[in-house]
Amino acid sequence: SYTRKSRKYSSYKGKVGTVAPNRIRRRFNTHIPHQKITTDTTEFKYYEVDEKGRMTMHKLYLDPFMDMCNGEILSYGIDKKPSAKNVMDALNETIEITADCPYRRTFHSDQGWAYQMKVYSHRLKEERIFQSMSRKGNCLDNSVMENFFGLLKQEIYYGVVYYSYEELKSEIERFIKYYNDCLLYTSDAADD
């Protein structure tokens, strides 16, 4: 759904499943890799020419999972529509990647419909992972991911028009690789 004022994508559909407590409570920092993970969904627009030669707008959705220890994007899904499969595939990959954590993990999100799904919360329970959710309508509760989205869109999206799904998808994937390989390394070196 969309809010009239900003037209920003909102995955909130009301209470459609499990709403978990906010376990993170803006305590984003951890020195333990793979202990605190955050996720969210963001939307991008691109254009294609239809069979009648008209320019039509389409959307692409990105579902990344980020390690709060170092900001690394551990896994992500990209699709033409918001989909449970996209979120679950990225979730399962992240669960596998973070299985080496010696402490109980916490996966944080907003209250979007995908994170309220029974299959999502059941998968976390299966792995003894705490589920945490931001308070309704409070983007500051997931500011780590919101900051990443802001950086991503500033670097590759604002002021640029994409003319195909593949072009936009490829640019997002290139940026995530660059972000993980170069930007995080640079920021880690600055902290030393």
Predicted regions and their residues:
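Basic, flexible linker segments flanking DNA-binding modules
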Residues: S1-P33, N138
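RNase H-like two-metal-ion nuclease catalytic core shared by retroviral integrases
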Residues: S10-K15, S109-Q111, M117-K118, M133-K153, ...
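An active-site-proximal beta-strand-loop segment
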Residues: R26-L74
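Active-site beta-loop-alpha junctions of metal-dependent nucleic acid enzymes
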Residues: H58-K59, Y76-D100
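Short, surface-exposed connector motifs at secondary-structure boundaries
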Residues: E72, D100-R105
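Residue-level detector of anion-binding/catalytic polar loops
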Residues: F130
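Conserved small/polar residues in nucleotide/adenosyl-binding loops
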Residues: Y185-D192
